Regions:
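Lipid interaction determinants
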Residues: 16-138
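Sec-dependent bacterial lipoprotein signal peptides
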Residues: 1-14
Length: 138
């Protein structure tokens, strides 16, 4: 039993070293990075140029983004410990295809309580539940 436990710990440590190295090397800063939505409410989102993006701006803790066709703006508060509050949000009022997804997008943003980073990915959570996943744009 002791050998099995030691072997399991060694295998886990070896695997994590590569993961942590990748995560640190490819991690992007929360602020100043343009984030592209790739998953919303557990469903994959096809990345479309100029749609469903988000940028956290340092000046006055502002947030800017684009939904299906509307510009989204507002404020955010973030801590280094992963606490994140977004909103209230405002947006332009154009109508276009994809409005249901845009509504779900803004609701996910406003319900966010925490964030986590995984390599070039930004994960938004609401009370422990994954709400949205973004990938850093190059």
């Amino acid at each position: 039993l002791r050998i099995a436990v030691i072997a399991a710990i060694a295998a886990l440590a070896a695997g994590c070293c590569k993961c942590r190295s990748y995560q640190k090397k490819n991690r992007r800063p929360l602020v100043g990075t343009e984030w592209q939505l790739i998953q919303l409410g557990g469903k994959a989102v096809k990345p479309e140029e100029g749609k469903f993006t988000l940028t956290f701006l340092a000046e006055e803790n502002r947030i800017a983004g684009v939904g299906a066709c509307n510009r989204i703006m507002g404020r955010y508060e973030a801590t280094e410990k992963g606490v994140l509050k977004i909103g209230p949000l405002a947006s332009t009022m154009m109508a276009c295809p994809g409005m249901e997804q845009e509504d779900a997008f803004t609701k996910a943003l406003e319900s966010t309580t925490h964030y986590d980073m995984d390599g070039p990915m930004l994960l938004l959570l609401s009370n422990g539940e994954l709400r949205a996943v973004f990938q850093a744009k190059p």
